[in-house]
Amino acid sequence: MSDTLLSRCLAKNIRMTSQRQIIIQVIEESDDHPDVDQLYLRSVELDNTISIATVYRTVKLLEEAGLIERLEFGDGRSRYEEAGEHHEHLVDIETGEVHEFYNEELETLKAEIAREMGYDLIDHRLELYGKKRKN
C-alpha cells in the first residue's frame, strides 16, 4: 500500500467511514493550507451529507493521531496540512498566501543555537511574514 494519509489512518486502526474518506481525500488533494470551513466546503462538493461537525471531529481525530498538523498564521484561523517532511512557511501578509520552503543552512543554524544554549533541539516552528517586493 502506498504511503497516503488514508493508508496511515488504516495503519493506526482509525475507523474509516465514507465521509472520513472524503475529508481525507480533500486534505490529501489540498495544495494550500485549508481551515475547517474550506475543508467543509470542498468536502460537501463530493458528498452533500457531510456536516461541518463531522469535519471538525475528523480533523481533531487526525490531529490527535499525529497525521495532520495545525498551523496558526496570526489570522485567527487554524489551518491544516498533512504531517510529513519538515519545512518552514513564509506568509504573504497582503494575500494570505503561504509558501513552504526548506533550507539546510537554516536547519543547521537552529540546531547550533540550541546547542550553544545547552539544549538538544527536539522540535520547532518557524514562520516568516512578508510583503512581496515590487520591482
Task: Explain the meaning of each model-derived region.
Residues 37-47:
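DNA-recognition alpha helix
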Residues 64-135:
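Non-DNA-binding regulatory cores of transcription-related proteins
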